[in-house]
Amino acid sequence: MTQQTPSNGAMSREQLLEVLRENYVFPGNFPITVIARSDLAFFAKLHVALDELQGESTYTVEEKPSSKKNFMSFRIEIFVESAETALTRKEAIGKIDGVLVML
């Protein structure tokens, strides 16, 4: 059975999960990069969300400012048990107020 891609060109959730399973080892570390404006409020929101999402599981955040210091790249690595957990947490991080781009 062939999975259909939604008409807007976006991948379905099942297709995304399949790609994650093919490219990452679970359980294991999963990378997420977030671009946001450089401000302490976003930094605080990001860390509160990660603490809530990860609970006892580990995570790291590496920050890199843009050349003009207007934006910040947050390179996040979270430990997850499965592709489903990775996708759910990535979606939750993407909903944090202030996220401009997520990779």
Model-derived features: where do they sit?
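Long, contiguous binding/interaction regions
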Residues: 1-73, 79-103
